[in-house]
Structures are given as structure tokens and as C-alpha cells.
Regions:
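Conserved SAM/AdoMet-binding glycine-rich loop
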Residues: 35-170
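Canonical Radical SAM [4Fe-4S] cluster-binding loop centered on the CxxxCxxC motif
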Residues: 1-24, 57
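Short glycine/proline- and charge-enriched loop/turn segments
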Residues: 10, 57-65, 202-207
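Short, ordered loop/turn segments at secondary-structure junctions
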Residues: 14, 46-48, 193
Length: 234
């Protein structure tokens, strides 16, 4: 599930709120997989880096004086990454608003962790990010990205970007192009906005961007991200 309220996303309505599995259960599953010969695992969650916050909240509500010591995502990385036999580990998908320096530290300290971060941008325009209810600004996004790269040398970074969100202006698109160029992605999953029935964004019909304009903007974005990828892989 997911506790966020992104205006274009139907997941919280269909999957409910976040539920973290106990750390011990996840480590035990990783140990079973490793014993069966599995060498790579992926920590998967709709908002994977918010892992453990619901467990902390439940502990506090139960009067547990040590609730704040309950494991969070960085602890999960370290615990699963230490399982004997596992050689590679990834996680997806994190949310930028919940990204913390201790996650980057855990990535750097865990030999099994692949040097890859999927870091969804969605838009480089603060105005559009606000309409999306993403909970971060472009500047904060880039600051966290710089911290990740400082902690994990040679980090490969991929992202998600949406073009044509309702009300997106040419200035908004320009800002997205600027941020995408500054981020220097290795790869980008790029999308044209598609309304999902039941979401806030789907009701913004009066602000839908002309499809021809969206298509042209999408191609301009592809040029930027493909140029960055080419430079990275030369």
C-alpha cells in the first residue's frame, strides 16, 4: 500500500495504506532464498523507503518506550544485505520526500547493494510537483541526489518523469528539462500523463494539455534524457 496522496495515482485507493512486514520475517525469507541458490533479491514496496514507520507508530500507540528504536529502511538494507550467500540486492521504488541520508550510508556500507538508485522525479517544476502532491521541491530532490552520489561513487541513477500533467505550462516543461539535464540520469522512464478514473488529476479536465503539445514536449524530454544517458555510457 501507500500513505501518499499523489493526485495522479490510484494505488492508495486500491491497495490501502502501507503495511511493513517485520524485519525478522524478511531476513528469514532472504535466508531461505539464499539457501535455495538465489543470489539477488529486490526489496519491493510502493514507497519502499518508508519501511518501518507504521511499525514505529503502532509501537508508540501501544506504549512501547523503545518505539523509536524499531528498525527503519536503512536497518532493513543492512540486515538483508548481510544474509550469507546473497551477492546482489536492489530496492524499488523509493519516494524522494522520504529519502534520508542514513539510507545512502546503508547503501555504501552494504557490499551486496547494487550501485543503482531509481529516484522518481515526475516533474522538475515546483508548481507541478505541488499539484501532484509530491511533497518535495526540485532543489531538495537534486540535493538528495547529490548526497546519494557522494555516498556511493559511480552510482547509476534512473527516474520516472511525466509530461503533460494537467495545467503544465511551457515554463513548467522548461524547468523539467533543466532539472533532468542537471540530474544526469543513466536512464529515464518517460510517460505522457494518462488520467486514472477516481484520481484528483483525472477530474482536472479543464486543464488537460492539448495532445499535440504533449507529444511535442515528450519528444523534447526524450532528447534531454537520451543525451545524458549517451554521455554516461560512452
Amino acid at each position: 500500500g501507500c500513505n501518499c496522496a499523489c493526485s495522479y495515482c490510484i494505488v492508495p485507493s486500491t491497495r490501502g495504506r502501507e503495511v511493513s512486514r517485520p524485519l525478522e520475517e524478511l531476513v528469514a525469507e532472504a535466508e531461505r532464498l539464499a539457501a535455495d541458490g538465489v543470489r539477488e533479491v529486490t526489496l519491493l514496496g510502493q514507497n519502499v523507503n518508508s519501511y518501518g514507520r507504521d511499525l514505529q507508530l503502532a509501537a508508540r500507540q501501544a506504549g512501547d518506550a523503545d518505539a523509536r528504536l524499531r528498525p527503519l529502511f536503512a536497518d532493513l538494507i543492512g540486515a538483508v544485505g548481510s544474509v550469507a550467500g546473497l551477492r546482489r540486492m536492489r530496492f524499488t521504488s523509493p519516494h524522494p520526500k522520504d529519502m534520508r541520508p542514513d539510507t545512502f550510508a546503508a547503501m555504501a556500507a552494504t557490499p551486496a547493494m547494487c550501485e543503482h538508485l531509481h529516484y522518481p522525479l515526475q516533474s522538475g517544476s515546483d508548481r507541478v510537483l505541488s499539484l501532484m502532491h509530491r511533497g518535495y521541491t526540485a532543489q531538495r530532490y537534486l540535493e538528495r541526489l547529490a548526497q546519494a552520489r557522494a555516498a556511493v561513487p559511480d552510482l547509476a541513477v534512473s527516474t520516472d518523469i511525466i509530461v503533460g500533467f494537467p495545467g503544465e505550462s511551457e515554463a513548467d516543461l522548461q524547468r523539467t528539462l533543466e532539472v533532468a539535464a542537471a540530474a544526469e540520469y543513466d536512464y529515464a522512464y518517460t510517460f505522457v500523463f494518462s488520467p486514472r478514473e477516481g484520481t484528483e488529476a483525472a477530474a482536472m479536465v479543464d486543464h488537460f494539455v492539448d495532445p499535440a503539445v504533449v507529444a511535442e514536449r515528450f519528444q523534447r524530454l526524450r532528447v534531454v534524457v537520451e543525451h545524458s544517458a549517451l554521455l554516461k555510457h560512452q
